Every structure is written in structure tokens, then in C-alpha cells.
Amino acid sequence: MLMPKRVKRRRVHRGSMAGQAHKGNKVTYGEFGLVALEASWITSNQIEAARIAMTRYIKRGGKVWIKIFPHKPVTRKPAETRMGAGKGSPEYWVAVVKPGRVMFELAGVSEDKAREAMRLAAHKLPIKCKFVKKEDLEVKGGE
């Protein structure tokens, strides 16, 4: 499960998920990518489930890059606890994903195999996703 080694603050504000992704919106390492079409919090368990789904399908064929990391702690108070008495303790970690963010990259496999691996990974995530090729995003960026 992904989580930071050390953090400055154990509890953070919820923040805003408005707008598009300005960073991490290009395929940089691999040939193919999985792009988010909606804004959401992606938990470390969901990232791990998507990674396992991809690597099991491509077997030893290609290489997978995870381009999102869960930096944000989500707190929760125990069940049947009265309101007040401070903020709850950190329960799990999430990555804030905005539309346009490339979440996973893949290289070393054919396009058909990459498309199917990304489809399996997208089913593990709580948002709509799109399969992209490196050339497609470079053409859009050059306009």
C-alpha cells in the first residue's frame, strides 16, 4: 500500500478538486497512458488494485509506471462517537486526481495488449478513464 514515509502534518484540510490537471497531463515515460476524465480521490488500495490488474495481464511483457501518489491523509472518527472532541485519526491515504491527469503509463507491449490492460485497471478505479497514446497527446499539445 502506498503512503508517504514522513509527513509534515498528520491531518490536512479537504481542499478543492476544481479545474483541470496542469501537471502530469502528458505521457512521459511509456508509450501508452490512462487519463482521468473526472475529478476524484483515488485511494492507495485502488491504485494497488489497478497496478495488480495491469501487471497480471501483461505478465512479464512490459513496464508499468504509476504517476500518482497518495499524499493526502483522510481521517475518520470511531463508530458511535459523539460530535466534537477533535478531528479523527488518519484512516487511509488518497491521491487527488483532476481531469486530464495521466495516472498510469505502460511500455514494451503491443497497443491491443496495452489497451486491454488499461481497461482492466480502469475498472478498479472510481472514475471514468480514457486510453491514450503518446503521439496523440503530443499532437494536442503542439496546437
UniProtKB/Swiss-Prot annotation:
InterPro entries attached here?
Ribosomal_uL16 (IPR047873), Ribosomal_uL16_bact-type (IPR000114), Ribosomal_uL16_CS (IPR020798), Ribosomal_uL16_dom (IPR016180), Ribosomal_uL16_sf (IPR036920)
Name the Gene Ontology molecular function terms of this record: rRNA binding; structural constituent of ribosome; tRNA binding
Report the domain of life of the source organism.
Answer: Bacteria
- Please note every region of biased composition (Basic residues): 1-14
Keyword Transport in record = no
Q: Which GO terms describe its biological process?
A: translation
Which residues, if any, are the signal sequence? none
Q: Which Gene3D superfamilies match?
A: Ribosomal protein L10e/L16
Region annotation Disordered: where it falls in the sequence = 1-20
Answer whether the UniProt record assigns the keyword rRNA-binding to this protein: yes
Q: Which GO terms describe its cellular component?
A: cytosolic large ribosomal subunit
Keyword annotations for this protein, in alphabetical order, are: Ribonucleoprotein, Ribosomal protein, RNA-binding, rRNA-binding, tRNA-binding
Q: What assembly does the database describe for this protein?
A: Part of the 50S ribosomal subunit.
Family per similarity comment: Belongs to the universal ribosomal protein uL16 family.
Protein's job: Binds 23S rRNA and is also seen to make contacts with the A and possibly P site tRNAs.
This protein is called: Large ribosomal subunit protein uL16
**Organism whose genome encodes this protein:** Clostridioides difficile (strain 630)
Source lineage = Bacteria, Bacillati, Bacillota, Clostridia, Peptostreptococcales
